[in-house]
C-alpha cells in the first residue's frame, strides 16, 4: 500500500541512511502497534503515512536554520509532506490528518487520538539508536 510513498521518502532522504532507517523502523512499529490496537483502516492509513513522513522536515530545517529540533520538524515537515503526498497520490482521504500528526509529533500535550499517541512514542525510537558503530575487540 505504501510502496510508492516509501520510495519517495527514501529518494527525498537519499544519502542519509540514518534517517531512512529511522522512518522505516517507526513505520514498521506503527503498523504493528496500530494493528494490535485495532485502529480503523482510515486511522491506520494516516498513522502509517505519518510514520513514514514524520521527520521529513529535518533536512530543510538544517538547510534553512542550521537546526532540526522538534519545532522546526513540525513546522517544515507538514509542508514537505503535503507536497510528497500530492506527488505520490492516493492519500487525499487522510492528508489532513497526516499533516496534523506530523505537525504535533513533538508536542506532548493535548494528544487527540491513538494514532498521535503511537507516533509520538515511536518517534522517540531514535534516542536508543546508536549514532556510530563501535568496535569491540
Question: Whereabouts are the PLM-identified features?
Answer:
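Active-site flanking loop/helix segments enriched in acidic
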Residues: 2-25, 57-67
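An amphipathic alpha-helix signature
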Residues: 2-6, 27, 74-78, 82, ...
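Alpha-helical phosphate/pyrophosphate-handling elements in metalloenzyme active cores
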Residues: 16-47, 82-88
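Histidine-centered active-site/metal-ligand motif
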Residues: 22, 54, 73, 105-106, ...
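His-Asp-centered metal-binding catalytic motifs of divalent-metal-dependent phosphohydrolases/nucleases
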Residues: 44-63, 77, 99-106
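Helix-adjacent hinge/juxtasegments
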Residues: 59-96
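Single conserved hydrophobic/aromatic residue that forms the stacking wall/gate
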Residues: 126-137
